[in-house]
Amino acid sequence: MVIKDVVILGAGIAGISACYHAQKKNKDVMCYEANDKVGGLVANFSVDGFRFDNAVHLSFTKDEYVRSIFDKTEYISHKPDAYCIDNGKWLKHPIQNNLFPLNVAEKISHIKSFIERPSLEPKNYSEWLEHQYGYSLANRYPKSYTKKYWGLDAELLSTTWIGNRMRRAEIDEILQGALEKRDDNHYYANEMRYPKNGGYFEFVRGMAEQCNIESNKEAISVDVENKTVLFSDGTATRYNDLVSSLPLPVLCSIIKDCPCKVLDAAKSLIWTTVDLISIGFDKQDIPPYLWFYIYDEDNLAARAYSPSWKSSDNAPEGKSSLQFEVYNLSSKDRLNPDKLIENIKVKLLEMGICSEEEIIFIHHKYLSFGNVVFDHCMEERRQIVLDYLNSINIKTCGRFGEWDYFWSDQSFISGMNTIDD
């Protein structure tokens, strides 16, 4: 049986970071990845010469150490000009600061409602939206989008995840954006960076290639008493220290003799899955937006981005591409891929993005984990799981290992911290 000082489960960006920093400290370490390809959510895939990431990925980290790693890769710098589409109208993001394309009646309704917004201490995300934007704006835009992105109504979500992810509304900005078309950047980053070649994974490829990683190694049992991990291929390894970036519900389900209270807490955690609909076009003139949000309820996708706008290396010469993201709650039945493809195809034509003849292919891929969902009291249930794992000396990292709304740089740091602690 193989024996290692440190065993790491999962070779997404957090697991890669943990492995890389363990090796820098001269630890005898091995990272095991269930899939045949490393990278997790920051991995990519190719279809007929087109490259796609697993959903939209752009780096805007301000952390100097992460920059020192990522910046070893030649990158393209983009302005974070995101847009939204709503009933055929393209509005700059965030919508509340860019109401200019709307008719006068809509503008008056939204602005009056903002001025008269309730003063309250929000108990949930719905009340937070009403407090920030007023009933009219909140109900028309972010509340409807919430159901598409999070899979739950806004009142069922807490507010602990928001941070700087949602732009607070200011009356001057709203009025300026209603009276004239504005080019101001109201996003939470001033620059978005993306590798010139190879897709988003290139930011960490150099690290991954230095790491001891075994692919196609799915952990199916963790015996804490004997410090042993068993894999689906029948092999096993012993460890002195165990680091896991596996989703908490998955990890707890494979721990031998995991207490019922902990299992129940882990099973209660919910998340979104993602269906990716990737399209290659036999033309270049698609909407010139890195990414855009989709408010139309009859369009099943919540968001789309253009790999070919992020880098021309992602598409053959003279071609272009889009990828649509359809989110679903983990507790619900999987969506039908054929119906998703048909829905997106119809909406592409309705939006005027292309003709049917200009579509080279429409490809479907399913991601079983997209984002953790912050329903009420999630943190208390999560803490039950984390306290137990800490008591048996299992360290966790990454978006799903810490069960938090981490961006890729935060997941990178999370993996590093499991070794530095």
Describe these PLM feature segments:
Residues S77-K79, S215-E218, G398:
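Short loop/edge segments at beta-strand edges and connector loops
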Residues A14, K37, P249:
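Conserved Rossmann-like nucleotide-cofactor binding loop
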Residues K4-C31:
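N-terminal Rossmann-like FAD-binding beta1-loop-alpha1 element of flavoenzymes
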Residues K107, K112-K227, R238, S245:
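Active-site/ligand-binding neighborhood in enzyme catalytic cores
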Residues Q23-S46:
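Glycine-rich FAD pyrophosphate-binding loop
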Residues K25, E218-L322, V326-D338, V346-G352, ...:
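Mid-domain catalytic core of redox enzymes
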Residues D48-L120:
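Dinucleotide-binding Rossmann-like beta1-alpha1 core, especially the glycine-rich loop
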Residues N44, W309-D421:
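Conserved flavin/dinucleotide-binding core of flavoenzymes
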